[in-house]
A protein has these predicted regions:
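Cysteine-centered motifs
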Residues: 4-6
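Anionic-ligand binding patches
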Residues: 12-20, 26-212
Length: 212
């Protein structure tokens, strides 16, 4: 399998008109589909193809994004775009990180209000000083059925705040306040969020590398 490395310029352009989004996360699907809309690409999800979620066995965003993208590309015979992302909190030594979604897992599905409460409780127990700096990190992997891929990383700096605010985002968005802003990602208009999010940062690099 020919996997690219992030320290070299992308060399393969995307020249198709169909793309699989290798995710079952409805929030991510909406956000990525909106970012891809200007390119006239027909987008389908992993669920549209009846794909199960592959086991994410890596301990990095890049590793897990590659697992998802290559699984979808090989299963469908179409190029596939995956995202692996999470929030890292400085005072928690970078947790939850790649385990961001795992922190929300319950027997009845993911409970992000519970996960956000857990993060804040841990910070309170440590008497972490304010502002409680954090960052959202995103890695996008565009994979082709022949095993080639391109990797793009994005980041949004900010802090976590309490109480969580807003219902426009998903995941940890309601407790993440981007640097220099007064609204959390959960309060922010989606178009405004798309201008500054970690995923948008990675997406701009993807567009420059593979679509421009």
């Amino acid at each position: 399998m020919s996997w690219c490395r992030c320290n070299r310029p992308p060399v393969r352009r995307f020249d198709g008109d169909r793309l699989v989004i290798a995710s079952h996360n409805a929030g991510k699907l909406r956000e990525i589909a909106a970012l891809l809309a200007p390119f006239g690409i027909t987008v389908s999800s992993a669920a549209d193809h009846g794909l199960k979620e592959p086991e994410e066995t890596e301990d990095t965003f890049v590793g897990n994004a590659r697992i998802k993208a290559h699984f979808a590309a090989q299963a469908t015979g179409l190029p596939a775009l995956s995202d692996d992302s999470g929030i890292t909190v400085d005072a928690l030594d970078g947790q939850p990180g790649v385990y961001t979604a795992d922190w929300a897992e319950t027997p009845n599905g993911r409970d992000f209000p519970m996960a956000m409460t857990k993060v804040w409780t841990m910070l309170e127990e440590k008497s972490a000083p304010l502002p409680r700096k954090a960052a959202f990190n995103a890695t996008l992997v565009l994979a082709w059925p022949d095993g080639h891929d391109e990797v793009f990383k994005g980041r949004a700096e900010g802090e976590v705040v309490w109480p969580a605010r807003g219902d426009k985002g998903f995941g940890f968005d309601p407790m993440f306040l981007p640097a220099g802003e007064t609204e959390t990602f959960g309060e922010m208009d989606p178009n405004r969020k798309h201008e500054m999010s970690h995923r948008a940062d990675a997406f701009r690099k993807l567009v420059t590398g593979c679509f421009a």
